């Protein structure tokens, strides 16, 4: 039986693509294994999916770009994780390893290279993350959402892989109930901060609720169930599944962080969006780079976090609604989206060519 290993975790963004690809391999008769951290979100997501996947937990350490004594301890964890991953490679004997990145992916990627297992890696951001910089050295091929320097010869630019499209979804009954609380004469804003919500958006909506709901209908996906409410011109919910696409359809403008997965979903849907990226003090600056790229391409408006005030938001909303046709045209003319089916075909073809 053909066998494939997946790895990636730490955030939902490092797991989502794996969860889209795994069913396709299973359908074609592959035995699927996953290497991650049993205490990580990757284990939770695999369990929730109900997919027939064998999960292997290994030790891992956080990769830091700054000096910390914790780096020493985590270095030993990574080394132990490599030995654990080597044992898994010898036991499973997979045809390939596919990595979506995140620090948990480093031990299995290195172990796969040492074992002679072909390694395929996906990078979502404009600048390659630290884990994937290591993975690139071990990779048979790396697939990139953004164009990368030609000097990186193992990289293939494939665009963003997403199952989202611009097709309107069916309207569930709950959406009709929400719409009854909204004012048809006001624009609808949707605040979304990624898989765990964004505290800055939650605080902004809470602190400015009265004024915001005078000017807009507000949807706030919070990641915090204690904030759940449905009232006049306001809907706040911790998490949504079946409602996600209908709520996106309902929104006139989406206010989002700058994570690659989310903004490319918005591009695929051709949704007007304002990007409020995480600053360099809270990240490696990848969201700022992603936002700048989207602004340069004419897909979005960028609003710095310190400018997220009532006045700053209103100016950004007015700008994007005033020039909405220009933004719509730029998004609809883009060629940066690849379907899951198309990417699966590319990956499977490369795996077949890479078999020894």
Swiss-Prot record:
It is found in: Cell membrane. Gene3D superfamilies: Glycogen Phosphorylase B (3.40.50.2000). Its main location: membrane. This is UDP-N-acetylglucosamine--N-acetylmuramyl-(pentapeptide) pyrophosphoryl-undecaprenol N-acetylglucosamine transferase. It comes from Streptococcus gordonii (strain Challis / ATCC 35105 / BCRC 15272 / CH1 / DL1 / V288). SUPFAM superfamilies: UDP-Glycosyltransferase/glycogen phosphorylase. It is a peripheral membrane protein. Keywords: Cell cycle, Cell division, Cell membrane, Cell shape, Cell wall biogenesis/degradation, Glycosyltransferase, Membrane, Peptidoglycan synthesis, Transferase. GO terms for biological process: carbohydrate metabolic process; cell division; cell wall organization; lipid glycosylation; peptidoglycan biosynthetic process; regulation of cell shape. Cell wall formation. Catalyzes the transfer of a GlcNAc subunit on undecaprenyl-pyrophosphoryl-MurNAc-pentapeptide (lipid intermediate I) to form undecaprenyl-pyrophosphoryl-MurNAc-(pentapeptide)GlcNAc (lipid intermediate II).
């Amino acid at each position: 039986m053909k066998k494939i290993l997946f790895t990636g975790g730490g955030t939902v963004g490092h797991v989502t693509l794996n969860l889209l690809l795994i069913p396709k391999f299973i359908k074609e008769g592959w035995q699927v294994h996953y290497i991650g951290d049993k205490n990580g979100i990757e284990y939770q997501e695999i369990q929730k999916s109900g997919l027939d996947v064998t999960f292997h937990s290994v030790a891992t350490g956080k990769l830091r770009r700054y000096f910390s004594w914790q780096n020493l301890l985590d270095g030993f964890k990574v080394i132990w994780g490599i030995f654990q991953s080597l044992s898994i490679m010898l036991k499973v004997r997979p045809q390939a390893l596919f990595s979506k990145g995140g620090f948990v992916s480093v031990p299995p990627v290195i172990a796969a290279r040492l074992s002679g297992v072909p390694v395929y890696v996906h990078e979502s951001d404009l600048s390659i993350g630290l884990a994937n910089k290591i993975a690139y050295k071990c990779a048979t091929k790396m697939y990139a959402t953004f164009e990368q320097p030609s000097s990186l010869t193992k990289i293939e630019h494939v665009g963003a892989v997403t199952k989202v499209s611009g097709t309107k979804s069916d309207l569930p009954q709950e959406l009709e109930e929400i719409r009854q609380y909204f004012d048809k004469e006001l624009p609808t804003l949707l605040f979304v901060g990624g898989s765990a919500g964004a505290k800055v958006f939650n605080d902004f909506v809470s602190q400015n609720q009265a004024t915001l709901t005078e000017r807009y209908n507000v949807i706030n996906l919070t990641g915090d169930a204690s904030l759940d409410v449905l009232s006049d011109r306001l809907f706040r919910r911790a998490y949504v599944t079946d409602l996600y696409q209908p709520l996106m359809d309902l929104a006139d403008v989406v206010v989002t962080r700058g994570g690659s997965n989310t903004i490319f979903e918005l591009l695929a849907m051709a949704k007007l969006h304002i990007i409020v990226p995480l600053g360099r003090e809270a990240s490696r600056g990848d969201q700022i780079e992603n936002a700048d790229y989207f602004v340069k391409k004419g897909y979005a408006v960028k609003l710095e976090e310190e400018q997220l005030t009532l006045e700053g938001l209103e100016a950004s909303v007015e700008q994007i609604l005033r020039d909405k046709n220009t933004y719509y045209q730029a998004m609809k003319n883009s060629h940066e989206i690849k379907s899951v089916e198309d990417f699966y075909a590319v990956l499977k073809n490369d795996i077949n060519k890479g078999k020894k």
